Structure formats: C-alpha cells, structure tokens
Amino acid sequence: MGVASFLRINQTDGSIEVGHINYSPLLQRKREGTEAMYLMMKWEIENGYRRYEWKCNALNKKSRYAAQRLGLSYEGVFRQMSINKGRNRNTAWFAAIDKEWKFLKECFVKYLKDENFGTSEKPIISLSELTKPILYKLDNDEFV
C-alpha cells in the first residue's frame, strides 16, 4: 500500500524531515494516506519538535502538490543540490512549524471526520480547500 519515513532527525534544532514516501494509488490523496501524514506531524509536534520538513525533486510535481495539500509552506529551491542519474537535481523545500500546527491540526481533524466522507470515499471538502487559507496567511506573514 505504501511507506513513509522520518529522515534527518535533528533533536538539537528540533526538526524532522519526512521522506521516502511511496504510496500506491490505493493511498494517494485518500483518507488513509492523509491520516498517516497527520499522525506523523502530530507525533513530531507532541514530542517537542519545532519543524516538519518535506523535500523533493523540484521536477516532481505530484510531490510538490502533496506537500502543499498537507499545508506545508513552500520555502524555495536549492539549485543543483545533488546529482541524480548523471543530471543536476534541484530540491524543493516545504515545511510546517510548531506555531502553525494548531491551524493545520484543525484542517486535518475537519477533513478526517466521518461526516466529511458520508457514504463515499471522496471527501465533501478537500484538504486543499481547508489548508489553502492557512498557506495564504503564511505566505503573507499574517501569522505571528
């Protein structure tokens, strides 16, 4: 079905990177896959970490979209960060920090409620619809 891992755990600075995410179509943009990401973020914050990071190949549009769907803020691209299969790889960075968690948690809880799914696997309100206003505020420095 799928796998996701914590990578680059930095206890000193309080950051954890999530990565090596490989979901089959059975989990992609589905309630169960989203809940797994929610639980990983929740664990990280509840255990005193301050920063939840997501990095991906800048050409991987599905991964970039997934990060933003989950409410992670786009932080930029590290150009020529590595060489992959003989080519330069640019790495896109996304993150959520502890101060944002209460807002993101509300989005996840609302999204994951049974009432949001009714009798269908498809949500009534998508997670993107819920996190989009949060990302807008983050990108416009409206959170202190």
Name each model-derived stretch:
Residues 1-15, 21-25:
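A conserved beta-strand-loop-helix scaffold within acyl/acetyltransferase catalytic domains
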